């Protein structure tokens, strides 16, 4: 029974680190409309921000209770504050990092850009998390051996 407390700590730490949900607040958007200014060059959209992009007024809003579902809204050309009811809207989910979203007659390609958990985190964050998990496991193992 010496191992009970360290083993429970290890299990809780593993569950906590594996349940960390990926969050998104930036999206790179292109569309297939030949007259659009963002056919080849992606435009960056931010969550909860009314922006002029791809020849339209757009905003992306998070769906309550989800870290990966969003509502993509298109507004009339004069509604630069996104104050009126959207002219078109559709919900999308960031699953594989890339989604196709049809809004009105336009289909947008949306690349979901994962948030960084801190400013020093780089694109190699997966290997950093693996290293941290290994260190946590080693610490728990050492504490079990010390008992």
From Swiss-Prot:
Residues bearing glycans: 118
Q: Which residues form the signal peptide?
A: 1-20
Q: Which residues form the propeptide?
A: 119-147
Which GO cellular component does the record give, naming just one?
A: side of membrane
- Location relative to the cell: Cell membrane
Major place of residence: membrane
Membrane topology per the entry is: Lipid-anchor; GPI-anchor
> In the UniProt record, does the keyword Glycoprotein occur?
yes
Its PTM note reads: The GPI-like-anchor contains a phosphoceramide group, rather than a phosphatidyl group.
Record keywords: Cell membrane, Glycoprotein, GPI-anchor, Lipoprotein, Membrane, Signal
Query: Which Gene Ontology terms cover its molecular function?
Result: actin filament binding
What family does this belong to? Answer: Belongs to the ponticulin family.
Name of the molecule in the record: Ponticulin-like protein C2
Question: By which gene is this protein encoded?
Answer: ponC2
């Amino acid at each position: 029974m010496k191992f009970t407390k360290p083993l429970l700590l290890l299990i809780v730490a593993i569950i906590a680190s594996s349940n960390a949900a990926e969050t998104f607040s930036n999206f790179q958007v292109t569309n297939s409309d030949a007259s659009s200014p963002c056919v080849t060059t992606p435009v960056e959209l931010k969550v909860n921000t009314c922006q002029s992009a791809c020849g339209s007024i757009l905003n992306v809003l998070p769906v309550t209770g989800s870290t990966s579902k969003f509502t993509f809204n298109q507004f009339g050309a004069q509604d630069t504050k996104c104050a009126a009811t959207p002219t078109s809207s559709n919900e999308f989910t960031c699953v594989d990092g890339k989604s196709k979203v049809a809004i009105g007659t336009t289909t947008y390609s949306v690349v979901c850009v994962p948030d960084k958990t801190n400013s020093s985190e780089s694109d190699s964050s997966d290997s950093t998390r693996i290293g941290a998990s290994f260190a946590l496991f080693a610490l728990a193992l050492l504490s079990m051996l010390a008992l």
